Amino acid sequence: MEKKYVLSIDQGTTSSRAIIFDKAGQIQKVTQKEFTQIFPNPGWVEHDAMEIWSSVQSVVAEALADVPAAEIAAIGITNQRETTVVWDKNTGKPVYNAIVWQSRQTMDICNELKEKGLDPIVREKTGLLIDAYFSGTKVKWILDNVEGAREKAEAGDLLFGTIDTWLVWKLTGGAVHVTDYTNASRTLMYNIHELKWDEEILEALTVPASMLPEVKPSSEVYGNTHKDKFQGMEIPISGMAGDQQAALFGQACFEEGMAKNTYGTGCFMLMNTGEKAVPSKNGLLTTIAWGVDGKVEYALEGSIFVAGSAVQWLRDGMRMFRDAKDSELYATRVQSSEGVYMVPAFVGLGAPYWDSEVRGAMFGLTRGTTKEHFVRATLESLCYQTKDVLSAMEADSGIELAKLRVDGGAVANDLLLQIQSDFLGVPVERPMCIETTALGAAYLAGLAVGFWADKNDIKKNFGIDREFDPKMEETEAAKLYEGWQKAVEATMAFK
């Protein structure tokens, strides 16, 4: 039977999805299933890794109800990054819940490592900061806090993996224990320059090397599905990348200096820096973009904590409208925010500030300020924060941004993208397919089996739904941005 499709498994923070793509990069089928969020203590976030596996089996079975498995050329996996699973390799069962990227339960471990002066070493070797966000301290926490776990780990009976690793292990019936360069680069344990697990950091974290998966390129046949899992078929699993890197690949940002921004609950921006790992002096992370065609390419990354969730706050907390889509309607009723600035630091500020203690603020209110000004100022705050991060990227890389590609739920808002283009002074491109994360995983998988010939073949599929060009005078944009910088400074001073 002709191989017509590639199946993407998109394992996210709140749901698992299966998406089937054809050769033109068009979606043929989407299935989705949510799973339980577990909050054992304030600031802790966990998932049941067996429930995640069950949700993946469910969405895959549903997707293959209409498309014969025999027509699937390959499977690609993209995943919530950093989320940590530790399981017994003999029973196949996790020894503890998966500790999610958002979870802060390892803050004490992070503080101990910082007190030992390890921050500069970790920064130089991994491109990351010592933070509870990343996997390394989560593995240590499980070994230190789950009865018998450390003994089992030292006996070689426990395995660690981020979600990609866990899913491949399950899909292959326990035959394959691998991760890819992108996911390894988010663990806090991987040397992104030497491309190996770092012994010095493993020793500091007291994590046995025997637990760790083999690190492979992002596009390679890792193994086949166990025939019991896929309608009796053995299908190659041949692409893997963390969600943000997969989106960069799905947006065809293959050249140095190309960047994408994902507007979700928060924002994630990545800029391709080519075969050079650029160290950041401006509060960004240095990470691996992908390993494809026998070479590793790098990216600068900036995370904004609050973006779409600020619009949700206007809807749910302030009751300003019933549907998030109405934010565009209200914001277009005024020509500007009339000097009103909103700094949405509800959970602190991410890149490039990294201040977890600061809280949100509004500035410039008068008797003439209306709900419409509030809403517009909130949308503008997403765009100002994006400019903050992209300015840091330009300063670190020495590359001037030529255009920005965008994806995520909020990009349906035309006004938001026009404001973004105005503030950046460059075109903003919204692609035809906004499922860029799943598409990136599909492309990586398809490349490995020859479903797509090369990156040029993929580029041909990339279509722009709409391009937003700057309409605002540069002097006006600069003046508004200066006001934003003052607002952030004042917000950070108020604690």
UniProtKB/Swiss-Prot annotation:
Name of this protein: Glycerol kinase
Notes on how activity is controlled: Inhibited by fructose 1,6-bisphosphate (FBP).
Species this protein is from: Maridesulfovibrio salexigens (strain ATCC 14822 / DSM 2638 / NCIMB 8403 / VKM B-1763)
Pfam family, one: FGGY_C
Positions that bind glycerol: 81-82, 133, 243-244
Record's GO cellular component terms: cytosol
EC number: 2.7.1.30
Keyword Flavoprotein on entry: no
